[in-house]
Amino acid sequence: MMLLQTEKALRLLEQYNTITILVPREYTKSKIKEFFEKKGYKVKKVNTLITKKGLKKAYVRFKEEGVARKVAEELGGL
């Protein structure tokens, strides 16, 4: 998993407690949610899409406030 650090991704992080990551195409929403819940984070919602370049992007929204920033720091961003 790779954290995206675009303007939109940072805005989502700050305003909506959501991280934006690139994941392997075979990952499902439930697999992504399970990954973060095993680490002890409560996930509210996962949305995925395939980009024009064929990459899979996931938006992961967390239930608890401020968790997205902590997760982003763990994934090597910010």
Swiss-Prot record:
GO terms for molecular function: rRNA binding; structural constituent of ribosome. Transmembrane segments: none annotated. It holds the Pfam family RRM_1. One of its GO terms (cellular component) is ribosome. One of its GO terms (biological process) is translation. Keywords: Ribonucleoprotein, Ribosomal protein, RNA-binding, rRNA-binding. Coiled coil: none annotated. InterPro entries: Nucleotide-bd_a/b_plait_sf (IPR012677), Ribosomal_uL23-like (IPR013025), Ribosomal_uL23/eL15/eS24_sf (IPR012678), RRM_dom (IPR000504). PANTHER family: 60S RIBOSOMAL PROTEIN L23A. Belongs to the universal ribosomal protein uL23 family. Part of the 50S ribosomal subunit. Contacts protein L29. Binds to 23S rRNA. One of the proteins that surrounds the polypeptide exit tunnel on the outside of the ribosome. This is Large ribosomal subunit protein uL23. It comes from Nanoarchaeum equitans (strain Kin4-M). The lineage of its organism: Archaea, Nanobdellota, Candidatus Nanoarchaeia, Nanoarchaeales, Nanoarchaeaceae.
